Design a protein with these regions (language model features):
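Alpha-helical scaffold segments that flank or form the walls of functional sites
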Residues: 145-218, 239-248, 492-497, 503
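Glycine-enriched alpha-helix->loop->beta-strand junction motifs that scaffold or abut catalytic
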Residues: 270-275, 301-304, 323-330, 351-356
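Histidine/acidic-residue-rich catalytic or RNA/ligand-binding cores of hydrolases
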Residues: 146, 234, 265, 284-294, ...
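His/Asp/Glu-enriched, well-ordered alpha-helical/loop segment
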Residues: 300-301, 305, 346-441, 457-458
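Active-site microenvironment of metallo-dependent hydrolases
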Residues: 2-95, 100, 105, 404-510
Length: 510
């Protein structure tokens, strides 16, 4: 997998063709100035183009602890319940996590540090877990959040979102849509995403999407996907994107190809040297993606590291193809049940020896938070298995545990995104993508079972602090260095412009 270089696309400054309503011209410096606070670095003589969001992002001059965190290369998270999800390292009722130069250096009780060159964070009455990994998100749709509250995948989503609203996106709309989703993910505890934004209407749209991901600080796999309109240069533009942004492996952003199960697309992904990410399901007789995967397998085109989304209603033979090829699976149970995709393939995956990852899919109908995802997954699997028992069936599969579902949301997500060498567990040597979750709130306390508290009791409000690659992105409940009021303003302006261009009628009062 190729990863991002330090090249930086230009982020559009406005969603309208006339930029006169903006306070500055559409340069990377000005767009980032609109969205991310870099005032301290600018005052020191730097330019915003030279400053990533992590620089000088204190919530206020009085937050001494945060300022110290931003300045130190070593951070000690002290005295929390630590769920490493690494079976060799183990979990701890009380332990410390030492971060050094963006990586996890040590995990154990009573880590001793000396001197002033370390920032200490009190994690008592907190649960420390790896960050959530969302393996399938149409992230550009942030400005369309919940616009399809009662929608189905067909005809509503395909007609209204893909067919009507997506063609009306400018590069600036793609930027703010992606940025708002990425920042929202960080706020909710998602530290990595496989983005499948199908709004690559022009190369400038693709540049804007990448710019937004870079500006957000979120870890991401950019699965370059299709778009709408005469300016689409998909899929051939993937070569330009790879040359421009993905010639280094030591970055937060990696490249993949989002595509249908088509032999030419699989061949292109192999030629470029990136994984392919495909939506697949059987809706017989009109759609048989399982048969397409069989043909791809016979042509030798299924490879380790490729990702298969939904995988609904597949027979055992298709599951065997995916498993034997080294492929990974992403399931979106809440969306699949709500929008009519079909019965989530949770048990099908498990019965065929595949450990699935979880994904939000999109936010135009439901929340993208992982607490909703984990609970929905656990409830669905347990309901179907228990119902089989009530119907008299014997030799039932085991019920999912909270720890297993938490693994789906973290390490299995990292495996699916081909990031498990970097993140997914709190293991020494991995990059520090870490969540600090409040366990002392009255809706969680007293803490009787840590995995159960995370999966069954918590919601995004319990995500207190978020680290990505050792950098603090959320602190004590607030995003770090983000002008949220300005972001909200630009989201609404962009939403209004897209809806107006598309001639789409919203229904605020439902």
């Amino acid at each position: 997998m190729a990863e991002q270089s330090k090249s930086k696309p230009t982020a559009p400054a406005t969603s309208e063709t006339n930029p006169s309503d903006c306070s500055a011209s559409p340069t990377p410096e000005n767009s980032r100035r609109h969205f991310l606070k870099v005032s301290a670095a600018l005052a020191a003589g730097g330019t915003a183009a030279q400053v990533m969001p992590e620089a000088a992002m204190a919530q206020g001059a009085g937050d001494i602890e945060l300022n110290r965190l931003l300045q130190q290369r070593r951070v000690l998270l002290k005295g929390g319940v630590v769920l490493t999800l690494d079976r060799q390292v183990g979990d701890f009722a009380q332990a410390d996590v030492l971060i050094e130069d963006g990586k996890i250096r040590e995990v154990r009780p009573n880590i001793a540090v000396s001197g002033d060159a370390v920032a200490v964070v009190d994690a008592s009455n907190r649960i420390l877990i790896p960050g959530f990994v969302d393996t399938h998100s149409h992230s550009y749709q942030g400005i369309l959040r919940n616009i399809l509250s009662n929608g189905r995948v067909d005809p509503d989503y395909n007609r209204d979102i893909i067919g009507t609203l997506t063609p009306a996106f400018t590069p600036a709309d793609a930027y703010i849509g992606m940025l708002s989703t990425a920042l929202g993910m960080i706020e909710m505890g998602t530290t990595a995403v496989v983005d499948v934004s199908q709004v690559n209407n022009t190369p400038e749209h693709s540049d804007a999407l990448i710019s937004a991901l870079q500006d957000s600080g979120l870890r991401a796999v950019f699965a370059y996907s299709d778009g709408k309109g005469p300016g689409v240069q998909y899929p051939q533009d993937i070569s330009r994107l790879q040359r421009t942004y993905f010639n280094s492996r030591d970055q937060l952003l990696a490249l993949a190809l989002g595509a249908p199960p088509d032999p030419k697309m699989f061949a292109l992904a192999r030629e470029v040297g990136v994984p392919i990410v495909v939506h697949v399901r059987n809706v017989l007789p009109q759609r048989n993606d399982g048969e397409k995967l069989l043909q791809l397998s016979r042509s030798g085109l299924l490879r380790p590291g490729d990702e298969y989304i939904h995988c609904l209603h597949f027979p055992a033979d298709t599951w065997r193809l995916i498993k034997d090829s080294g492929g990974h699976v992403s399931l979106s149970p809440p969306i699949e049940m709500t929008m009519g995709h079909g019965t989530p393939a949770i048990q099908d995956a498990l019965d065929n020896g595949v450990r699935p990852s979880l994904s939000s899919d999109h936010a135009v109908t439901l929340s993208s938070d992982f607490f909703t995802l984990m609970r929905s997954t656990a409830i669905a699997q347990r309901y179907f298995v228990l119902q089989r028992g009530r119907n008299g069936e014997q030799n039932l599969p085991p019920l999912l545990t909270c720890r297993e579902v938490l693994e789906f949301a973290t390490i299995e997500g990292a495996r699916c995104a081909n990031l498990d060498g970097k993140v997914g567990t709190l293991s020494p040597g991995k990059e520090a993508d870490i969540l600090i979750l409040r366990a002392d709130s009255l809706d969680v306390w007293p803490l009787n079972n840590a995995p159960g508290a995370v999966v069954n009791l918590m919601n995004p409000s319990h995500v207190e602090t978020v680290f990505i690659a050792g950098k603090v992105r959320k602190w004590h409940g607030s995003l770090v260095g983000v002008d949220e009021q300005r972001v909200r303003q630009r989201m609404q302006e962009s939403r209004d412009a897209v809806v107006r261009r598309a001639g789409f009628q919203m229904n605020l009062l439902g």
